[in-house]
Amino acid sequence: MPSCCKQVREFVDFGKHLHGKLKELYDDLNEHAQLERVKMLLDFLSRHEQHMEESLARFEQESRLGILEAWLEYSPGLDVEAAMNKFHLPENPTSDEIIQIALDFDDTLVNLYKEVAEKANDSQTKAVFKNLLQLEEKEKIQVARAAMMLWEM
């Protein structure tokens, strides 16, 4: 297959790896955080990213092999390090800055899955990316709810 193309599995792996890197980021920030509110937020986000990484791993295990091996002509960049470097946090971020970064990363995956779902040629591949899109949109809502609860404290 030409290098312009990617398999469905590569997109799922990208999501898993990005969630794993985000968990590491939140864990690292938590080690240096001083405010209890920030620590609580980072702990929540770390557990949440771990859950998302595990959810994508289960999704991959439970999916038919054929659909994961399907090729897509649409081929955006899937570089986890580039995605991580796209957003910058100060050394001691506030809870607002952390929430904004979390939502920005969610948007990265939401936009990717939405675009791939729109460009996919067959209905099964479209369905896979619509499911991934729903999973990420639910995550974004959970992060927003956690942020609201934190602000009310």
Functional labels for PLM-detected ranges:
Residues 1-153:
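Non-heme di-metal
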